[in-house]
Amino acid sequence: MSKMITGAEYPLGKVFSDDFEYHIPQYQRPYAWTTEETGVLFSDLRDFFMEEDEENYFLGSTVLIKQDGERRAEVIDGQQRLTTLTILLATIASKLSGVQRDNCVIRIKSQGDIFMHIEEQPRLFLRQRDQPFFSKYIQGIDIDGLLALDPTQMEDEAQRNIQENCRTLNNAIDEE
């Protein structure tokens, strides 16, 4: 069987859909985006949506290893952006209620099905060391709990970056 390299453009709704389950391999660097990079991403997205431009917004490239027909995708490049977008979605969800909140949360976690005994699943799995933290605060939409944590008590720099970028996004949304 020959291996193929293919490229495709997807809208954000498809990127965070049941078509993909992203896994960050252990060999990838930890989450390292600074508040500056996060602020630029937020500003770019805000400006694009405020202009109501008919053109597509290029969010950047993501390189995956993924078999056709499979949800699981190993993230080779783009993990910083995917992680930051998930933090943004969680921050937005924390400010919403009802159906609006649910519509945002399904971009962070697949719904599952109690009748089929399928549990909800995160769409993004970080490196093992940071996944429990990310799952609890970001994928669990506990933004207030995350922001209340003492950064000196966190296990590593990746967790502090998650908190700081969440704070940056939270403040930016509140200012809008």
Question: Predicted segments — roles?
Answer:
Residues 1-176:
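Glycine- and hydrophobic-rich flexible loops that cap the catalytic core of alpha/beta enzyme folds
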